[in-house]
């Protein structure tokens, strides 16, 4: 080939410029010596080997269509621009596969492989495990960059790791994750996980920096919903949960093959827990729930937002402010009873205990909710979405400034601790269940059984709070310290509630504000319980020994008991 090419080039270069080349390949000089099916093109590189490039198609017809001429500089450099005329090139009908740029100069001819960066259009699927194969027990090293992209996904089902945004290899520990993050989380939950962030616990975790901070990586694993029992549970119900589970927003932003964004399964906890939660709560109450399932139930029990639905005129007066606050409190009390009934295990307590717990804790629950709503608004108290007061605006109410300052201080402390919603709902449930401790004086068998259930429920909610704290990714020592800080705030809220009761009672005595039935009953019951301890009386109206004509204890005639009974009847009718 090389020996025959040199005289060919000499013949072409030796032609006189006055004799133009013919336009058609069939009229080229015979010195070229090339058949119609091949084109001999010298290589521009320094090597001496030359090869023929064959078109994937039949030979050119007798009267071929002339394609636009290509510059000779695409094939070899010319010392004289007039020394070589334009060389027409006949294009073949179709290539076996489509390239994005066909007429580029010297397209790379290396074979297409199904490597990591090759196009998904050139391969039907990647190689690896199916998502429903679970987490497996292989000891994989997350330091291997290829291990994180070896997931088995069809083009339309491609997913990304919710932790580092690399290609997901499957559904591991309750979320879509790559092999590296799966192996890291497995090692963390099985062995040493006392990681400490060298910075501020806000390190960026992505595909390139996922190994820079183990503490922040583990924290993000928990934030995105990875859990120890998630993989085994999801292994059986993967297809069903994938069809029916709603999606949530997360910090990750995965994109599909065509660039379409995919929403991640959002949640502080995975949504697939909803089906086992409903079955367990119907069959065995809270005793059949794991801590994460209990947290999910308490989250679902959260009441909706409230509105005052009226505009307060400025300047504010003592009567207008107190009237607005009591109206909001009365609305929240109605929702609070429904909220308490949705906490797993609460309806298993006796009616007397349910009423007693609500009467003891209602203002603490309201104040905790007020602090939570105000956590992102420094210097303001968000009583409702349409009633926001700062410290100066509350100065018109006599004796309320100390309460305002304590509320702002509590909200500021929650903001410093970066309180999570899972922790907040657990604290609120603890306030409800731990509000009254004098029920030990009751000797009735029903009440003793109810109190035993209450203590078990209190332990379960405490375990749920510990689990919620463990999701923050802190070390064991830091988790213990955080638990202590959160529980110490409950005593602050109890002290604040007592001051609020005294202030509301003074407003009632001065006739500054008109209290509604439910709020008035709650206030009177709380003040009565703070003055003395009730005598030991069997107060369960369901006791068989109780005659239908036997008068009920006074607390069971209250509006609270009426609302609790109404909720019980409505739930029974729905079932």
Curated annotation (Swiss-Prot):
Ovary and testis. Residues 537-549 have a biased composition (Polar residues). CDD domains: NR_DBD_ER, NR_LBD_ER. It holds the Pfam family Hormone_recep. It comes from the Eukaryota. It is found in: Nucleus. One of its GO terms (biological process) is response to xenobiotic stimulus. Its main location: nucleus. Residues 134-145 have a biased composition (Acidic residues). Residues 108-151, 537-557 are annotated as: Disordered. Residues 161-226 bind DNA. Residues 290-526 form the NR LBD domain. One of its GO terms (molecular function) is peptide hormone binding. Binds estrogens with an affinity similar to that of ER-alpha, and activates expression of reporter genes containing estrogen response elements (ERE) in an estrogen-dependent manner. Belongs to the nuclear hormone receptor family. NR3 subfamily. Binds DNA as a homodimer. Can form a heterodimer with ER-alpha. Composed of three domains: a modulating N-terminal domain, a DNA-binding domain and a C-terminal ligand-binding domain. This is Estrogen receptor beta.
């Amino acid at each position: 080939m090389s020996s025959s090419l040199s005289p060919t080039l000499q013949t072409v270069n030796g032609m006189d410029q006055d004799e133009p080349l013919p336009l058609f390949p069939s009229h080229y000089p015979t010195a070229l010596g090339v058949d119609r099916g091949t084109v001999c093109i010298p290589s521009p590189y320094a090597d001496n080997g030359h090869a023929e490039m064959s078109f994937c198609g039949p030979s050119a017809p007798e009267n071929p269509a002339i394609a636009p001429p290509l510059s000779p500089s695409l094939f070899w450099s010319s010392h004289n621009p007039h020394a070589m005329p334009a060389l027409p090139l006949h294009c073949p009908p179709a290539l076996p596969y489509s390239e994005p740029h066909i007429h580029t100069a010297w397209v790379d001819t290396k074979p297409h492989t199904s490597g990591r960066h090759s196009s998904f259009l050139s391969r039907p699927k990647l190689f690896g495990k199916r998502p429903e194969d679970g987490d497996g027990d292989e000891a994989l090293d997350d330091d291997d960059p290829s291990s994180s992209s070896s997931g088995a996904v069809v083009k339309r089902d491609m997913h990304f790791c919710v932790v580092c945004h690399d290609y997901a290899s499957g559904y591991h520990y309750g979320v879509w994750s790559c092999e590296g993050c799966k192996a890291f989380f497995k090692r963390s939950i099985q062995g040493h996980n006392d990681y400490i962030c060298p910075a501020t616990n806000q390190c960026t975790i992505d595909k390139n920096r996922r190994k820079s901070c183990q503490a922040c990586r583990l924290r993000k694993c928990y934030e995105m919903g990875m859990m120890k029992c998630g993989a085994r549970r999801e292994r059986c119900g993967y297809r069903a949960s994938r069809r029916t589970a709603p999606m949530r927003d997360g910090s990750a932003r995965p994109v599909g093959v065509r660039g379409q964004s995919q929403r991640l399964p959002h949640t502080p906890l995975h949504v697939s827990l909803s089906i086992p939660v409903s079955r367990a709560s119907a069959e065995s109450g809270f005793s059949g729930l794991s801590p994460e399932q209990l947290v999910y139930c308490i989250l679902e029990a959260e009441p909706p937002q409230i509105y005052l639905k009226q505009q307060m005129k400025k300047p504010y007066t003592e009567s207008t402010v107190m009237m607005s606050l009591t109206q909001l409190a009365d609305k929240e009390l109605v929702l609070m009873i429904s909220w308490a009934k949705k906490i797993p295990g609460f309806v298993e307590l006796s009616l007397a205990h349910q009423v007693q717990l609500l009467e003891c804790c209602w203002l603490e629950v309201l104040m905790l909710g007020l602090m939570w709503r105000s956590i992102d608004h420094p210097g303001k108290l968000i009583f409702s979405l349409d009633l926001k007061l700062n410290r100066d605006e509350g100065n018109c109410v006599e004796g309320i400034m100390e309460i305002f300052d304590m509320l702002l201080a509590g909200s500021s402390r929650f903001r410093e601790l970066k309180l999570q919603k899972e922790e907040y709902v657990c604290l609120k449930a603890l306030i409800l269940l731990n509000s009254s401790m004098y029920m030990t004086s009751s000797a009735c068998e029903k009440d003793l059984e109810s109190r035993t259930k209450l203590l078990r429920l209190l332990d379960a909610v405490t375990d749920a709070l510990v689990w919620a704290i463990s999701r923050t990714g802190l070390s064991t020592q830091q988790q213990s310290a955080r638990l202590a800080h959160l529980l110490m705030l409950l005593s602050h809220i109890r002290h604040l509630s007592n001051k609020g009761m005294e202030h509301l009672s003074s407003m009632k005595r001065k006739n500054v504000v008109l209290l509604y039935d439910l709020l008035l009953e709650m206030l009177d019951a709380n003040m009565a319980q703070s003055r003395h301890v009730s005598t030991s009386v069997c107060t369960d109206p369901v006791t068989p020994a109780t005659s239908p004509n036997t008068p009920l204890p006074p607390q069971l005639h209250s509006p609270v008991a009426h609302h609790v009974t109404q909720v019980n009847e409505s739930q029974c009718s729905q079932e």
